[in-house]
Amino acid sequence: MYKIDLNCDLGEGFGVYKMGNDEEILKYITSANIACGFHAGDPKIMHETVRLSLLNDVAIGAHPGLPDLAGFGRRNINVSPDEIYDMVVYQIGALYAFVKSEGGVMHHVKPHGTLYNMAAKNKKLARAIAEGVYNVNPEFILFGLSGSELISEGNRIGLRTASEVFADRTYQLDGSLTPRSAGNAAIITDIDKAAERVYRMIKYGLVMCEQKKDIGIKADTLCIHGDNPHSLIFVRKINKHLKDLGVYIEKIIHE
């Protein structure tokens, strides 16, 4: 039996600005990563996204990012491990309070954007994130790029981790994601192609990188980005395609 968690980054609007169609996307995913105010999101949006996630029985996770509203958390900022630790704890705490106020349970933490990419390769930053998560609640599951330093540091400290793969992104030979600065080479828009790649990741633990070689990959959770106009169509079709191939879509259960 093949199974996968389907996660999406949500609550990424700000004030009067709306990003994506969260209410509809929640019908097709099993885990939501909710922005916590640094790269996107605000108290009202956080509260509403938590409420909608609970209504749809979707696992709730904090999605902490760098303090970069103008750049959507995707610009490089020089920060120390101590600063990263504080930012992560602060943002987790903010979302944790909303989840608790609605009678829910927080499930996981997944860093956003540049913070996620830095933690994939930088052991010290990865350790700061893992320690921040563990010290808030050691029961939280840490989502990170498959094969990354973040997964290694999460495992080292004693967190349960979930290795994440991407349906709409391409990979490099070292297992990292192709930078968005590469333009079209970084993004997969063909839904059938994306679904076939994901199925291969789940079944065989392999993905073809941009250098035309197979690399090993572990797929516990699949990310669908929610910040573009076609996200709803993409997630709906990926969900159906995987189910048609016999893959169970289900949230990761705490052990």
Swiss-Prot record:
Record protein name field: 5-oxoprolinase subunit A
GO MF, any single term: 5-oxoprolinase (ATP-hydrolyzing) activity
Similarity-based family: Belongs to the LamB/PxpA family.
The protein's enzyme class: hydrolase
Quaternary structure (record): Forms a complex composed of PxpA, PxpB and PxpC.
Entry-linked HAMAP family: PxpA (MF_00691)
Top-level division of the source organism's lineage: Bacteria
Residues in coiled coil: none
Keywords carried by this UniProt record: ATP-binding, Hydrolase, Nucleotide-binding
Pfam name, any one: LamB_YcsF
Species assigned in the record: Clostridium kluyveri (strain ATCC 8527 / DSM 555 / NBRC 12016 / NCIMB 10680 / K1)
Listed EC numbers: 3.5.2.9
Reaction catalysed by this enzyme: 5-oxo-L-proline + ATP + 2 H2O = L-glutamate + ADP + phosphate + H(+)
One Gene Ontology biological process: carbohydrate metabolic process
Function: Catalyzes the cleavage of 5-oxoproline to form L-glutamate coupled to the hydrolysis of ATP to ADP and inorganic phosphate.
